[in-house]
Amino acid sequence: MDSQARIQANLRHIQAFEAKPNPKALPETAVTRGFEKVAFPKLVRELTCDNAVVRKKSLLAARELLSSPVNHVQCVAAGATPAIVALLQDQTDDETRYYAAGTLKLLAAKEVGARDLAQHSGLDALAAALEDPSEGVRDEAYGALIEAARFDSTRRALEACGSGAVLPRLMELALLEAQGGAAGRAQQGLVLLFTCTQARHNAGILSQLVDVAQAIPHLAGLLKPELPMPVRHAAAELLGALATREDAKIQAVQVGAVPLLLLAASPSVPVPFATSAVAALGAITIRREGKYAALESPGGLAGLVSVLDPCHEQLCINAMTAVSNVAEAPEARAILVASGAGPKLQHIFETATVEVVKRAAAQAIRQCRFKHLPYEVLPGAPPINEE
């Protein structure tokens, strides 16, 4: 091949690689990845654009970024929270609200996101979304609030929301969901309220629920055997938290909560539900009224004895606490002994390897054997006259 032919072949080779069509323009609704720090302002820009399809895609993109701790902080710093909260209030599109509520659940997974959510009225927006016509939006809103309420700052913010009207309204909504057959959302509502009661300073929250919402009689109604187990479990858990107040203990006895709780003191009941119910009994039976309500419930004390099983440690501790409380009533001690409490407690005391279980068993043994003052020496403790 002469030089001219080689030149022509080379030109054809170059033309073959140069003759490419221009890249096609992307459609208006295409969402492309932004790299490094460009991604976060771009995300906020797309969340606030005029195109509904782009906004939905941006909400899904935000979930991907929020799943990374480093990116989570940068999303918050870029201003994603108010943009997502605004989309949660978009009354024109159920799907947008659904995506927004689910994205806020991821945002609230970290305390920095939960705090930012509270600062931009996100908690009020989520509380309003609990009454959304779309069931999917309500489900996601409950999930987001439960996630945010893991932090004490959010619990305090929820207490103050709506001038103190949000938590009582949550109690009403939980009842409405239970009556409507939506057991899952009713349970979520009760779990959210229980989480709020775990605030470091919870006197205001308890007051809103006990005094304003009149939660005690409602919770007693939710303990009825015909209701779904998850609802009864969540109701027992919340009742135990509210029963830290003395007037709530008395009210729980008056509305008949004690016999309903004792129904859960059985080996046939799922352990988590039994654990919560017996814990609530332990709180209520501190009062004299609670002791005699348990004593007068048919088969109630035998039920407590039946769950004295060290295989389920927390349930066993709760049951021994309740037994110790009830045994302060003289009439209860004979019934407990007849139900076989003595040998069970002694076995737990002798075989326990955890100090808190051993101490709870010792307290229950001493209380069941009590005849007169002064108290006998606690089992396992050294004699009083020893140095």
UniProtKB/Swiss-Prot annotation:
GO CC aspect terms: cytoplasm; cytoskeleton; motile cilium
The keyword Metal-binding belongs to this UniProt entry's keyword annotation: no
The organism's place on the tree of life at top rank: Eukaryota
Compartment(s): Cytoplasm; Cytoplasm, Cytoskeleton; Cytoplasm, Cytoskeleton, Flagellum axoneme
SUPFAM superfamilies found in the cross-reference section: ARM repeat
Annotated ARM repeat ranges: 24-67, 69-109, 111-150, 154-198, 204-244, 245-286, 289-328, 330-370
Keywords of the record: Cell projection, Cilium, Cytoplasm, Cytoskeleton, Flagellum, Repeat
Residue stretches spanning the membrane: none
Family note: Belongs to the flagellar radial spoke RSP14 family.
The protein's name: Radial spoke protein 14
Organism whose genome encodes this protein: Chlamydomonas reinhardtii (Chlamydomonas smithii)
Protein's gene: RSP14
